[in-house]
């Protein structure tokens, strides 16, 4: 695990990966450990797909500005192939069969998505 994980922003983490000072797997280990520690109190992450992210780290991520950086996607209207989409609503439970354009673009940057975060229902704030 990479103990200095919280001392860097996404560009700093990507720079460390590109220099070979830390691996995408080590960053993911750190992100998963923090999520496991903090999420029970926060309920911020509602869908986890750690195994998929570990497979991606092992197989190799696209080369981009954020290669190897762990990422959490907001569960609004962003389809991530093979993962659920609820938009924060109990009335919506879509199993995504494609990546939305924003997800395609994020993947192209090399981020390693390992979950989806909570949102108010349909993203509405009253």
Task: Map each language-model feature to its residues.
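Histidine-rich, glycine-flanked metal-binding segment
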Residues: 48-65
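An N-terminal boundary/leader segment
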Residues: 1-47
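Short alpha-helical functional segments enriched in proximate histidine and acidic residues
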Residues: 34, 38, 56, 109, ...
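Residues within well-ordered alpha-helices
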Residues: 12-13, 60, 101-102
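Short secondary-structure boundary/hinge segments and terminal tails
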Residues: 34-35, 53, 122-125
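Short glycine/serine-rich loop/turn segments
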Residues: 66-126
